[in-house]
Structures are given as C-alpha cells and as structure tokens.
Amino acid sequence: MFDSKFYKRVAFLATPIALQSLITIGVNMLDTIMVGNLGETELSAVSLANQFINIYHIFCMGIGMGASVLIARYWGMKKEEPERAALALRKTVCIMIRVTVALALIFALGMLLCPGSIMRMYTTEQDIIRLGVVYFRYSIVTCFFLGLSLVCTIGLRSVGQVHMPLFVSIGAFIVNLCANYAFIFGKFGMPRMEVAGAALGTLIARLFEASVICGYLLFADKRIGFRCRDLLMKTSDLVGEYVRISIPVLISDGILAIGGNTVAMVIGRLGVTFVAANAITSVTQQMSTVLIQGVCQAGAIVTGQTLGEGDREKAQKQAGSFLRLGIGLGLLSAVFIMAVSGPIISSYNVSEETAEVAAQLMKAISLIIVFQATNSIMTKGVLRGGGDTKMLMLADNIFLWVLSIPLGLLAGFVLHWSAFWIYVCLKSDQIAKTFWCIIRLRGGKWIKKIRV
C-alpha cells in the first residue's frame, strides 16, 4: 500500500539535506577552479592539505551521525516521557559537542606542531610541502568552526530542523566565494594572498556558518532546548549509552575513510590512464549520490523517531518502503549516469585510450550505484537509525578489507582485467552489503533498545 504521508515526510527531510550536499560539492569545485588558476603547485598543495582535513571531516560526520541515532530516538520518546527524553536530548548534544572539541584540538595541535610532517605523508615535493604548511596555519582555527557547525547541523536535522541549516549553507557558500575571490587574487582592496587567501576564505566562511548554526542551537531552537548553561551539565549517566551506540559509527566511518584512501592508492598505481579516467568520472559519482545521501539521513531520522515513539511494527514497514526506495533511486541514478557519460567524457581533451577507460568506468559506476543506493539507505539510514551500529561497524569493514580491496588488487595487478571489472571488484563490498542488509532487515534483530 502506498503511504503518501511517509513519502512526503521523507521528501521533506531528504530534499534540503541533498541540496546542502550539492552546495558542498559546488564549494569544493569553486575552490579547485580558483586555486587552479594560480598554478599546479598551488592546486596540489591545497588538495593534499585538504586530504588531511577531510579525515577530520569524516570523523566529525561519524560523531554527528552517531549522536543523531540517540537524538532522533529521544525526540520520538518525548510524547511518552517528555521530561526524561528532553534531558537525555540535551545530554547527548552536550557529549557530542565535547567530543567534537576534543577531536578538533587533536587535529589542530597536529597542524600546529608538525604541519611539514603531515604534508610529507602525501608528497616529497618541497614547494608543495611549503605551500601546504602555509594553508595549515589558517586551518588550525578552522577545525573548531568546521566541527561544531557540522555536528550541530546533524543534531538539528535529527529533530526535523532541515531547512535552517540549508539556508546557512547557502549563505556560507556566498561568503566563501566572495572571501576566496578577494583574498586569493587581491580584489576589493584586499592583499593578494594566493594559497593563504584560500585558507583564510574558508576560515571566514566556516566562522560565519558556525556562528549562525551554533547561535541558533544555543539561543533560538526550542526542539532540543539546548542552552549555554547545558555545556557544563553532568552527563556521566549517559556516557555509556553514547559510547555503545555512537562510537561504533565513529570507528566505522573512520576505518572506512582509511579504506577509501587505500582504494585510491590502488587506483593511483594502475597507471596514468586509469587515474585520469577516474578523475573524469568523480564529479558524476558525487552528483549521482547527492539525493541518495539525503534519503540515507532521512532514513536514520524517521526510523529513530518511529522507534522512539515505541512503534516497532511501523518501523519494520517503513524499512521495507526505504528498501524499495533505495532500489528505485539506484535505478534512476544508473540511467542518469549512462545519459550524461557521453557528453561529460567528450568535454575533456584526453586521449582515445583514456576516453575508452572512462566510458568503461561510467558503465561500472552505473551498475554499482544500484547496489550502493540500496545498501546505503539501509545501512547508513534504517539499520543505523535502529541502533544496530556495532553490527554495521563489523559488516562495513569486513566487506571492505576482506572482499573488495583484495579483489581489486587481484583484478588490477595479477589478472590485469579491464577497467570495468577492476572497478566492480574494488566496489564489490557494495554488492555484498546489499544482500547482507536485506537478510539483516528481515531478521528483525537490527532494532535495539536505547536507555534514557
């Protein structure tokens, strides 16, 4: 039976989240274009410095998404136990903020004390290292603003506040664009700072974003009701539950990030042609998963709130709807990729060999996206929202490290298969997880009790 209210609710949550992801992609593309105008050395320095910052970003996402499981569940409980649920909500946000600040401090100290050593992990080129160190000087402070705005945004989304963070992201995009243009190229009477200007522009944009998001959470939001005085509240009675539910998400996302870098290293050693072809397809991959990411987060929010209300049967039915939605979005994404692959590849001035490899990769991506959409909405959405975070942590990493990376190495370096099959092997964990999560879903063991 078609439940129009359910799909309207999912669309209400997923659309702003997807648009916010699209804006983030746009910001990254603009940064690349602007810094790219300075030269290859400058572009490489900023790109490699951001590789380290992206690790921090992924860890913050893990902190936020882990906390969101509890926040959504407690928000759903407010009808039955309003006082206890409201207190648990504030305690969860307090722990989330404290963990984020601690993590930001660790990364900031790393960039302050040994920026050169960090850059040398990625390159041996002295000019690139020197410029990367310059970029890190401004990014030390950026870490705190980036982390706080990110986790507070996820927290607000978990109680249905999805539009306000979207509008703030649009504002931050405009601020970032203007600040980068002014400081990179020395416009509007500002000094020409080049790489340092790119870092300063990002710092200003993150300061704006964090000020508005955190200001709203601390002074205006009435759903969570978190205020400045709550930053000092006692949370010891909820730390155990936070660790049990949230930390596996943080560990899972962190290890997956390392695994993703390992896959990138494998691709990097398959030759210039494969690397160039993969670069051509990267934007298409990002664009095709924007809506999927939105539905993933909507799945976690809806599932958590429904279980918080105590309606287990309804959550099971909604899980089935999310499964069908994942398959449908995957098929639509596959059609989109195949439709745009030709024009995108032809827009690049590359050799015939690179164009052929890119075409093979596009076909492989269009196949994998069906499985990726389905399992992502199930694992990062429904099952995570159900509190099944420990099992997800194990499944994510077993399928990646035991299946996809060994198969990718075998296909690329031993069997020397075509680009299509190498990519399919590197992403085979997506296929395996799809069947695993369907089995897990039917078993019903994914729904975990959460203590208030």
Language model segments and positions:
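Helix-terminus/linker motif at the lipid-water interface of multi-pass membrane proteins
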Residues: 22, 26-44, 119-126, 182-193, ...
